[in-house]
From Swiss-Prot:
InterPro entries: ATP_synth_F1_dsu/esu, ATP_synth_F1_dsu/esu_N, ATPsynth_dsu/esu_N. Keywords: ATP synthesis, Cell membrane, CF(1), Hydrogen ion transport, Ion transport, Membrane, Transport. It is a peripheral membrane protein. Signal peptide: none annotated. This is ATP synthase epsilon chain. F-type ATPases have 2 components, CF(1) - the catalytic core - and CF(0) - the membrane proton channel. CF(1) has five subunits: alpha(3), beta(3), gamma(1), delta(1), epsilon(1). CF(0) has three main subunits: a, b and c. One of its GO terms (molecular function) is ATP binding. GO terms for cellular component: plasma membrane; proton-transporting ATP synthase complex. The lineage of its organism: Bacteria, Pseudomonadati, Pseudomonadota, Alphaproteobacteria, Rickettsiales. The gene is atpC. Its main location: membrane. It comes from Wolbachia pipientis subsp. Culex pipiens (strain wPip).
Length: 113
């Protein structure tokens, strides 16, 4: 199976995936799927979720701000202001949800006094 490497760069973080089979991104021109040995390409990316289909059949999702994607020599580089692995973002949202529930329950306890 043909694969390629994807690297995300931001001022605060760097994420790298080896053995990517396909990469789905949203640019100004619409949705684009990058495959191994894609011709050289440069595109402006819109904020959103980038999905990397890995060779082991898993999917990695990364949330980005506006950015630029470059494809060259079977490598894909994405430069953006902010990057966050989607699983970590989901986990953070769950912890925030738990905190909101706790605050609400505390409010009900005080109100019932």
């Amino acid at each position: 199976m043909n694969t390629f490497k994807v690297q995300f760069f931001s001022p605060d973080n760097r994420i790298s995936f080896d053995e990517v089979v396909s990469l789905s991104v949203n640019g100004l021109e619409g949705e684009l799927v990058i495959l191994a040995y894609h011709s050289p390409y440069l595109i402006y990316l819109l904020p959103g979720i980038i999905t990397a289909q890995m060779s082991n059949q898993t999917k990695e999702k990364v949330v980005i701000d506006n950015g630029i994607l470059e494809v060259a020599n079977n490598n894909c580089s994405i430069i953006t202001n902010q990057i966050q692995v989607f699983d970590h973002l989901t986990h953070d949202e769950e912890s925030l949800k738990d905190k909101r529930v706790g605050i609400y329950l505390s409010y009900l306890d005080v109100k019932s006094l």
